[in-house]
Structure formats: structure tokens, C-alpha cells
């Protein structure tokens, strides 16, 4: 979100001001701008595994006389929402949802009612968001709805292993889909990694629009793979990465480019589960022997068949010596 000229101006102005105030000659400046020089050589590419979208009230959903009063109140808000009352409607919807969540936590409403509340609340949020886009002056509370409505794209990587600066110092990296570029991305999303950590997400992006907390993405197409690229990661991300949740080094491909095109120089396999377990003093060979002993005794005791034992051992070895990420 700044140019090289901006960067130079800010850096040099400090020296100029200090030199002028001290009435001394301007110095020769020698700098090593690490990220600027080295970041460009590396790109992180990962697959989107799954997505979640907030629920919505569908046409087939009906309100029954037996439904909870909070559901009926929220349904009336949704039916009557309009541009002139959108802020009031949003406040009322938030209040009803909060009351419903409190009652749910005390066991006073059931799971079905909770689901109805969620569907109606997020349907109201979408309506208010659409209406607000047609107004000149949007209240800050309404602006926040856009961020709340983003999908979550769960991706096959570890933020702490591959993009530690995004977590540690809020570094913003350029991120975008690397295919389907002839299609307009109609969804917006935040990125979630594979770790169990709530910090394992990216919700701050480079953006020329007023939506830096979400990224434009495409909807997934059935079982077709969908990949995102994170650029300018060559400045020490791989070196700084750690083994949070025991996700290891990723697969790497060295590519050289010349006037005639590109060629793949080297393919380096990422770490296996056995390798990362070794870091925390687990002996993979001993683990396999232990499982082999259990399988042998189970076959002899008639607990499992010989074929089941062979299949179990094959799957165990395959997992243990396989990639730490999903394959």
C-alpha cells in the first residue's frame, strides 16, 4: 500500500532533517533492504480444501405457530426491513440474537430454534448490507457487516510454518487465485489454515477497495481443485516458520526462467510425519514395530483377519511416512 518512492522519501527525510538541523553534510547512505530485495523469488501455493458460508433463510423455510417468539420477532424484522429503517432493524436484530444466544446457553431454547435465529439474523445482515451499498453515508456499524459476511476458505497450509510474519508482525502479503483468471470472483472470503489455532487465519489483505479484511475468490466447482498463491514470501518466511501442530516444511519446486520460457530445476519433498515426530523424540521405527506386534497378536487371536492386518499396517506406514499436509 505504498510505492518505492514513498519508502525512499520517508527513509531519507529523517537523515535530511537531522543533517540540516545539525548543520553537517548530508551522509552517503548504504542500506540493505532485505525484504525488498529477496521477497520476490518465492511464492507459496496451496489448495482450498473446504469452505463455509453463513446460513440464510430459504423459501422453503416456514414460520409455524409453535415457533419461539424470538424467531417470530426476527422474521417480522426481515420482512419489513427497508432502507430508511436499516440501522434500527440491524440494532433490533442484534439484540434479539444476543437474547437468543443467552437463552440457548441456559438451555431455554432448543437447537432448532437456535438454527432458525441464525438463518434469519444473517439474512437480515445480507439485506442491510445490500441496502447500505446504495446510500452515500454508511454508518460505521453497517460497514462492519461486510466483514462479518465473508466466507471462510480452509486451506492446506500452516500460517505458522509458511507465513509466520502474517501472524507475528501483521505483515500483509499479496494473495490471489492463480487460475480461473478469466472468471470474475464473485465471493469474498478470509483464509483459514489447517492448525487448531484461532490465530491461524488471514483476514487482512492488500486492497484498492474498502474491503481490506476479505479477498475476492471464486466459488468452488464440485471436486475441481482451487489454488491460491501468496507472493513475496522469499524474505525469510521458510526460515522463520515453526512446527506448530507439527506441520512441517512444504514441498518445494525450484524453477528457472529465461527468454525461452521456464524449466523445473529441482523438486524437493516436504517433511514427512515421521521426520517431524523425530523432532519431538518419537522413534518412527519403534512405532511401526509396536503396531506390527499388535497386528500379529490380533491376527493370532482371531480379532482381525490376515488381510485386515496387512491393510491396517499398510495404511499406518503410508500415513507415518507421508506428507504432514493433506494429500
Language model segments and positions:
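Short helix-capping segments at alpha-helix termini
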Residues: 18-24
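Alpha-helix-loop-beta-strand connector modules within alpha/beta enzyme cores
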Residues: 4-18
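Glycine-rich tight-turn/loop motif centered on a GG-T
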Residues: 1-5, 52-54
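Charged (often Lys/Glu-rich) extended helix/loop segments that serve as interaction or gating elements
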Residues: 24-28, 33-327
